[in-house]
Amino acid sequence: MRTEYCGQLRLSHVGQQVTLCGWVNRRRDLGSLIFIDMRDREGIVQVFFDPDRADALKLASELRNEFCIQVTGTVRARDEKNINRDMATGEIEVLASSLTIINRADVLPLDSNHVNTEEARLKYRYLDLRRPEMAQRLKTRAKITSLVRRFMDDHGFLDIETPMLTKATPEGARDYLVPSRVHKGKFYALPQSPQLFKQLLMMSGFDRYYQIVKCFRDEDLRADRQPEFTQIDVETSFMTAPQVREVMEALVRHLWLEVKGVDLGDFPVMTFAEAERRYGSDKPDLRNPMELTDVADLLKSVEFAVFAGPANDLKGRVAALRVPGGASLTRKQIDEYGNFVKIYGAKGLAYIKVNERAKGLEGINSPVAKFLNAEIIEAILDRTAAQDGDMIFFGADNKKIVADAMGALRLKVGKDLGLTDESKWAPLWVIDFPMFEDDGEGGLTAMHHPFTSPKDMTAAELKAAPENAVANAYDMVINGYEVGGGSVRIHNGDMQQTVFGILGINEEEQREKFGFLLDALKYGTPPHAGLAFGLDRLTMLLTGTDNIRDVIAFPKTTAAACLMTEAPSFANPTALAELSIQVVKKAENN
């Protein structure tokens, strides 16, 4: 039906007769001449109709936005004064000789000249996807997956599919369950990841595996989360953690070079402890130059319980954040930041405004200065390298609250004051995570998942002191986003059962949920390690959007609903009966 794409016409096509298919993006009727911007997935080209082709001109008068049409005409160079430098096709236009209206369009529920609500965009997603910026994002996503496949093929990885209907295993979130008609009362689970299957593939001897795969998690959603999401899933045998990181770093550098023309360079490596200490986060945004500085040792003897309490508590922390130029902040802005840190459990926000250091106490402004002597204040200013015009904020509480609150404040202030260089790319690896974390009920939970190997510990040592265990795990972080994470896996049955025991999974439950894995570990399991990237998040970064729904063709809302198809929906009673399922209405509270 067509010979060329609209957006691919250039000066090299001048004089050629072309047939185009697409949509009317805009129409301008000048009476004796009608111009339209015609759009397809590759872009927009200007088409005009003149009186010498009367039939085509007459039919063109009926055109409206989003009519689906076919145009045949001749490519012409535009006059110099009419060249549109903002369009890829701006040096040419098409003089139409014939026009076919393939399909007319009703008045659109979306307005291309205004910002539409996200609800409307999701309800009429098929229209929203016609927008050039949306089409470009999905084209970029397709390019990314193509680049990944070629890279992985070139590096000896095999693309192997794993099951979608599998067994429920605890991986940190709720499973989506699928009832079995054949096995009454039993359920499959949609995979949260192919974790165990890819480990079993290593035990099968496939050595290098990858898959671009859908995963499912029934969890409370955020702006950057979806109930179904896509992973670039990778597993390797006989490779150390640094070797895995080297190959995966090469993949991501390849993507940035091909898609953005940017060489990311070598990725720095930082331990979890260092990231938390310096940035208050295990996914630090290194485009932001500000760092947290520990000052507890300077404040142990002050008569100010807000500082002295955490300073003398082994589980406490007092951290300072120097904000360059922050002395210009108003009291209202400071109060807003104080309320902001309360979201993260902090009780408030102490500060010192550094107006003129040379004047000592007279050169600062601080509600807590009366609790601190000149010597302590000077020591704090020295340690934070404070200069005239700076602001120093303080966080004082238990270590987690200080890290969470001050880490979040660092990001917010960096953005608000323009201190974060958003023109840069700042990748890094974060390694050496704690293996376990407190579950809040006196037990331990796996920080990553229960199949991660500890670093340099035997099963007996791990059992004796699990709180000291460091996971042989690694996350890739770019501009403050965790884009991928992985670990060296447990390849020894005793170690795996020890980890299960620490997590409170008794032997009976181990056999019930993981018997197949424990059996497989008996038969010469190779050491193996892997990683998974979030394709949606990678694409979000590479396309410059801050909303993950912009890079998914048909995403769900934050309530895990599809506004277009109205999923989820009630099931047919007959289908439920075949599955031996009865829906019980929840009693309403009176």
UniProtKB/Swiss-Prot annotation:
<dbReference type="InterPro" id="IPR004115">
    <property type="entry name" value="GAD-like_sf"/>
</dbReference>
<dbReference type="Pfam" id="PF01336">
    <property type="entry name" value="tRNA_anti-codon"/>
</dbReference>
<feature type="binding site">
    <location>
        <position position="482"/>
    </location>
    <ligand>
        <name>ATP</name>
    </ligand>
</feature>
<keyword id="KW-0547">Nucleotide-binding</keyword>
<keyword id="KW-0648">Protein biosynthesis</keyword>
<dbReference type="Pfam" id="PF00152">
    <property type="entry name" value="tRNA-synt_2"/>
</dbReference>
<dbReference type="GO" id="GO:0006422">
    <property type="term" value="P:aspartyl-tRNA aminoacylation"/>
</dbReference>
<feature type="binding site">
    <location>
        <position position="448"/>
    </location>
    <ligand>
        <name>L-aspartate</name>
    </ligand>
</feature>
<comment type="similarity">
    <text>Belongs to the class-II aminoacyl-tRNA synthetase family. Type 1 subfamily.</text>
</comment>
<dbReference type="GO" id="GO:0004815">
    <property type="term" value="F:aspartate-tRNA ligase activity"/>
</dbReference>
<comment type="subunit">
    <text>Homodimer.</text>
</comment>
<feature type="binding site">
    <location>
        <position position="226"/>
    </location>
    <ligand>
        <name>ATP</name>
    </ligand>
</feature>
<feature type="binding site">
    <location>
        <position position="489"/>
    </location>
    <ligand>
        <name>L-aspartate</name>
    </ligand>
</feature>
<dbReference type="InterPro" id="IPR006195">
    <property type="entry name" value="aa-tRNA-synth_II"/>
</dbReference>
<dbReference type="GO" id="GO:0005737">
    <property type="term" value="C:cytoplasm"/>
</dbReference>
<dbReference type="InterPro" id="IPR004365">
    <property type="entry name" value="NA-bd_OB_tRNA"/>
</dbReference>
<feature type="binding site">
    <location>
        <position position="171"/>
    </location>
    <ligand>
        <name>L-aspartate</name>
    </ligand>
</feature>
<dbReference type="Pfam" id="PF02938">
    <property type="entry name" value="GAD"/>
</dbReference>
<dbReference type="InterPro" id="IPR004524">
    <property type="entry name" value="Asp-tRNA-ligase_1"/>
</dbReference>
<feature type="region of interest" description="Aspartate">
    <location>
        <begin position="195"/>
        <end position="198"/>
    </location>
</feature>
<keyword id="KW-0067">ATP-binding</keyword>
<keyword id="KW-0436">Ligase</keyword>
<dbReference type="InterPro" id="IPR047089">
    <property type="entry name" value="Asp-tRNA-ligase_1_N"/>
</dbReference>
<dbReference type="InterPro" id="IPR002312">
    <property type="entry name" value="Asp/Asn-tRNA-synth_IIb"/>
</dbReference>
<feature type="binding site">
    <location>
        <begin position="217"/>
        <end position="219"/>
    </location>
    <ligand>
        <name>ATP</name>
    </ligand>
</feature>
<comment type="function">
    <text>Catalyzes the attachment of L-aspartate to tRNA(Asp) in a two-step reaction: L-aspartate is first activated by ATP to form Asp-AMP and then transferred to the acceptor end of tRNA(Asp).</text>
</comment>
<feature type="binding site">
    <location>
        <position position="217"/>
    </location>
    <ligand>
        <name>L-aspartate</name>
    </ligand>
</feature>
<dbReference type="InterPro" id="IPR012340">
    <property type="entry name" value="NA-bd_OB-fold"/>
</dbReference>
<keyword id="KW-0963">Cytoplasm</keyword>
<dbReference type="InterPro" id="IPR004364">
    <property type="entry name" value="Aa-tRNA-synt_II"/>
</dbReference>
<dbReference type="InterPro" id="IPR029351">
    <property type="entry name" value="GAD_dom"/>
</dbReference>
<protein>
    <recommendedName>
        <fullName>Aspartate--tRNA ligase</fullName>
        <ecNumber>6.1.1.12</ecNumber>
    </recommendedName>
</protein>
<dbReference type="GO" id="GO:0005524">
    <property type="term" value="F:ATP binding"/>
</dbReference>
<dbReference type="InterPro" id="IPR045864">
    <property type="entry name" value="aa-tRNA-synth_II/BPL/LPL"/>
</dbReference>
<feature type="binding site">
    <location>
        <begin position="534"/>
        <end position="537"/>
    </location>
    <ligand>
        <name>ATP</name>
    </ligand>
</feature>
<dbReference type="GO" id="GO:0003676">
    <property type="term" value="F:nucleic acid binding"/>
</dbReference>
<dbReference type="InterPro" id="IPR047090">
    <property type="entry name" value="AspRS_core"/>
</dbReference>
<keyword id="KW-0030">Aminoacyl-tRNA synthetase</keyword>
